């Protein structure tokens, strides 16, 4: 009887979960490489720990669980950490621009660009097309369309009357100059639009003359450069011709000797 009990115990310990009612005989225990009794105990301990945690989460229900979740949600939210995209890059760009303006780099670059433009105008290297691209304002048209001159301009009381060319039929001197006496020897008047247009035309003509002079100077320099290149080319061809003649003469002398 004692031997049968020991045999039953041994079969139960070696079955490792197989059904005892099965007709299949239990296999012998196989040793797994790298797995020992200590590692099996660690796995069982980890399994027991996970089961206990699952039980605690199931038991932890009601208002306490809701309070715990709400508390974690509030702690995780940080309103100051959220930023729009591109804020840091814009701040850095603004700081660099402010520093450049404060140091005077922007003003220096503008003055340097203006000086280069003036040098080109003085040398006549600025073409008409480039000038039109640089200056996008038509000053002549702007002066003609200007119909609201500034009302306050002080003149001397001994101002002369406007010429007869600017008068129309039925107009007198007072229609072209609106004069108001402000005191002894002083008067406040407004110049007519025709005089303003005439001044703008004079400035426009001066600008055109200066532009024509610059164009002529540029053409003259281009012609001089072309003539210089042509002279150099002729001199180079002459030298090459002299070299060829010298080589032919040398070959003829060698053949004779």
Curated annotation (Swiss-Prot):
UniProt biased composition (Polar residues): 151-160
One cellular component (GO) term of this entry: nucleus
InterPro entries to which the protein is assigned, alphabetical: CCDC174-like
Phosphoserine sites (modified residues): 127
Superkingdom, natural source: Eukaryota
Coiled-coil blocks: 196-257
The protein's name in its UniProt record: Uncharacterized protein At4g18257
Alphabetical keyword list: Coiled coil, Phosphoprotein
Spans annotated as Disordered: 146-174, 210-231
Keyword hit for Metal-binding: no
């Amino acid at each position: 009887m004692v031997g049968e009990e020991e045999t039953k115990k041994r079969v139960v310990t070696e079955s490792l979960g197989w059904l005892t009612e099965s007709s299949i005989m239990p296999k012998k225990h196989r040793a797994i490489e790298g797995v020992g009794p200590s590692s099996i105990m660690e796995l069982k301990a980890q399994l027991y720990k996970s089961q206990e945690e699952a039980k605690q989460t199931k038991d932890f229900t009601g208002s306490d669980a809701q309070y715990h979740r709400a508390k974690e949600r509030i702690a995780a939210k940080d309103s100051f950490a959220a930023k729009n995209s591109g804020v840091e890059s814009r701040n850095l760009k603004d700081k660099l621009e402010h520093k450049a303006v404060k140091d005077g780099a922007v003003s220096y670059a503008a003055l340097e660009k203006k000086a280069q433009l003036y040098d080109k105008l003085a040398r006549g290297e600025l073409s008409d097309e480039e000038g039109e691209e640089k200056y996008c304002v038509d000053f002549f048209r702007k002066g003609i369309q200007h119909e609201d001159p500034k009302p306050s301009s002080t003149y001397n009381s001994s101002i002369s009357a406007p010429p007869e060319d600017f008068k129309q039929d039925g107009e007198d001197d007072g229609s072209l100059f609106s004069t108001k006496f402000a005191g002894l020897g002083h008067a406040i008047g407004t110049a007519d639009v025709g005089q303003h247009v005439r001044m703008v035309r004079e400035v426009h003509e001066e600008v055109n003359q200066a532009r024509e002079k610059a164009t002529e100077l540029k053409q003259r320099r281009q012609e001089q450069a072309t003539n210089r290149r042509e002279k150099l080319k002729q001199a180079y061809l002459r030298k090459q011709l002299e070299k060829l003649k010298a080589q032919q003469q040398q070959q003829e002398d060698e053949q004779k000797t």
